[in-house]
Swiss-Prot record:
Molecular function GO terms recorded: DNA binding; DNA-binding transcription activator activity; nucleotidyltransferase activity; sigma factor activity
Residue range(s) of DNA binding per entry: 301-320
Organism of provenance: Helicobacter pylori (strain J99 / ATCC 700824) (Campylobacter pylori J99)
Entry GO terms, CC: DNA-directed RNA polymerase complex
NCBIfam families membership: PRK05932.2-4, rpoN_sigma
PROSITE patterns, sorted: SIGMA54_1, SIGMA54_2, SIGMA54_3
Single GO BP term: DNA-templated transcription initiation
Primary role: Sigma factors are initiation factors that promote the attachment of RNA polymerase to specific initiation sites and are then released.
Protein name: RNA polymerase sigma-54 factor
Similarity remark: Belongs to the sigma-54 factor family.
Keyword Ligase applies: no
Keywords on record: DNA-binding, DNA-directed RNA polymerase, Nucleotidyltransferase, Sigma factor, Transcription, Transcription regulation, Transferase
Length: 414
C-alpha cells in the first residue's frame, strides 16, 4: 500500500478540512455544484461554473456499451440495484446460483431482455448450460415482471406465470395467443379471447420500460483504463465544477480578506475531495487488479480503506456511496468492490464456498472428502483457522450432501 501512503496529505490538514467540508466529499458528482453553491452563498468572491461533459464516451468507450446494463455510460441506477437486491435465498440459495444470476443481470440489454449465448456464458462460469438456464428461468419470479426473458413472447410468458390466474381456461387462452402473436386474430372467436387480450395489454413491454422512462445519467468519478499495456487510474476531472476567484477587485476590505480565505478553504476542500477519490481508485486498482483484467473480485473490506485514510468505516462508507467507477468491464458502484470478510481475514465467504465447490467437483468418487479433510485443505490454502461446523454449514448452504451420502450417490451412478 506504499503507493497510497506516499500520496496522503498530512493528517491534521485532512482532518480539519473534512470536519468543515465533509458534505463536499460525500455528495454525488451530479450534486456537487449545488453543494458548492450553498457553501458560497454569501461570498462575493466566488464564481462556480459547471464544465461537465454530458457524454464522456469520446474519452472512455466501454465494450457493447449500448447493449448491456452495467456497460451503459448513461444507465439506470435503480434497475441493477433493484435486481441485485432480489438475488437472495430461497430463490437463489447457493453461491453458484447467485453468481449465475448476477451474470445474467450483467447480460441484460437496456430493455431488460437477455440476448447472450447461454452456452458461452455457462462455459465462462464453469457450469453446465442446463444449470445456467434453470437459474435464468427463475427470473420469471423477479420484478420488474418479464425481466431476463429472451424475447417478447417469453417476457409475456414470464408475466403470465406471475399472474397466478384462477381460471385455467383463461390462462391457456392467453398462453396460446402469446405463442401465436403474429396470428392472434385467428382466435378472435374464442370465448376468452377478449379477456386474454386485456391481460396482454396490461403486460410490460419491454420488461424494463419503467426504468427506460426514468433513466438517470450515471457519471463515473473514476476511470480505470489500460493504456499502452499499463493499467492506470484517471479522475473524471472534466465533470467537476470549477471555482474561480475575483480577488483582484477587493484588496483593502478586511471583510473581503476574510471571504477570500473562506473561498480558498472551499477550493482546498474541493481539491481534497478529488485527491481522496483518486486515492480510492489507486487502492481499488492495487487490490482488485485481477478484476480489471477480467477475473474475479478479491475480498476487500471498507476497514482497509478506512485505515488508509485514518477515518471511521462509516465516514468512508458515506464517502463512496452513490459514486461510480468506469472500466473496460462496465460502470460499477464503487461499493461493488467491497465485501464482508470472514473472521477478519483476507478471505471472504464467497471465496471459501467457491473453493469448497471446486474440491467436491474434483474429489475422488470412491473416497469423497469428509468435512474434516475439507477443513484441512481450506486452512492450508488460505492460511486461516476455522472450525469444522463452519465447513458443514457452508456445505449444507450449497446443497451438498455429506461424504457418506455422496459416496452412495456415486456408486448408484457408476
Amino acid at each position: 500500500m506504499a503507493i497510497l501512503r506516499a500520496n496522503l496529505s498530512p493528517k491534521n490538514k485532512l482532518n480539519a478540512t473534512l470536519k468543515g467540508w465533509l458534505p463536499i466529499l460525500q455528495s454525488e458528482l451530479e450534486d456537487l455544484e449545488e453543494v458548492l453553491k450553498q457553501n458560497a452563498l454569501d461570498n462575493p468572491l466566488i464564481k462556480i461554473e459547471n464544465k461537465r461533459i454530458k457524454n464522456f464516451s469520446d474519452r472512455f468507450n466501454t465494450k457493447k456499451s449500448s447493449d448491456h446494463l452495467e456497460n451503459c455510460a448513461t444507465a439506470s441506477k435503480s434497475l441493477f440495484e433493484t435486481l441485485e437486491s432480489q438475488i437472495i435465498p430461497p430463490l437463489f440459495p447457493t453461491e453458484t446460483s447467485q453468481k449465475i444470476a448476477m451474470d445474467i443481470i450483467s447480460g441484460l440489454n437496456n430493455e431488460g431482455y437477455f440476448e447472450e449465448n447461454i452456452e458461452e456464458r455457462a462455459k465462462v462460469l464453469g457450469v453446465e448450460s442446463e444449470v445456467y438456464e434453470k437459474v435464468r428461468k427463475r427470473f420469471s419470479y423477479l420484478n420488474p415482471a418479464g425481466i431476463g426473458a429472451k424475447d417478447v413472447k417469453e417476457g409475456f410468458l414470464f408475466q403470465l406465470d406471475g399472474r397466478e390466474l384462477d381460471n385455467n381456461e383463461l390462462y391457456e387462452e392467453t398462453r396460446k395467443i402469446i405463442l401465436n402473436l403474429e396470428k392472434h386474430h385467428e382466435f378472435s372467436k374464442d370465448f376468452y379471447y377478449e379477456k386474454a387480450l386485456k391481460i396482454l395489454k396490461s403486460f410490460k413491454n419491454p420488461p424494463a420500460i419503467e426504468f427506460l422512462e426514468k433513466e438517470i445519467e450515471v457519471i463515473p468519478e473514476l476511470f480505470i483504463l489500460e493504456v499502452d499495456n499499463e493499467m492506470i487510474v484517471r479522475l473524471n476531472d472534466e465533470s467537476y465544477p470549477t471555482i474561480s476567484l475575483e480577488e483582484n477587485r477587493f484588496k483593502d476590505s478586511d471583510y473581503l480578506k476574510e471571504k477570500l480565505k473562506e473561498a480558498k478553504d472551499l477550493i482546498d476542500a474541493l481539491n481534497l475531495r478529488k485527491a481522496t477519490i483518486y486515492k480510492i481508485g489507486l487502492m481499488l486498482l492495487e487490490y482488485q487488479y485481477d478484476f480489471f483484467k477480467g477475473k474475479e473480485l478479491r475480498p476487500l473490506k471498507l476497514l482497509d480503506l478506512a485505515n488508509e485514510f485514518n477515518h471511521s468505516v462509516s465516514t468512508i462508507s458515506r464517502a463512496i456511496s452513490n459514486k461510480y467507477l468506469a472500466c473496460e468491464r462496465g460502470v460499477f458502484p464503487i461499493k461493488h468492490f467491497f465485501s464482508i470478510a470472514l473472521d477478519n481475514s483476507e478471505t471472504s465467504n464467497a471465496v471459501i464456498k467457491d473453493y469448497l465447490l471446486e474440491l467436491i467437483k474434483n474429489e475422488d468418487k470412491k473416497e469423497p472428502l469428509s468435512d474434516a479433510k475439507i477443513l484441512e485443505l481450506i486452512e492450508e490454502k488460505f492460511h486461516l483457522k476455522m472450525v469444522r461446523r463452519t465447513i458443514t454449514k457452508y456445505r449444507q448452504l450449497l446443497n451438498i450432501a455429506s461424504s457418506s451420502e455422496r459416496k452412495r450417490l456415486y456408486l448408484m451412478r457408476a
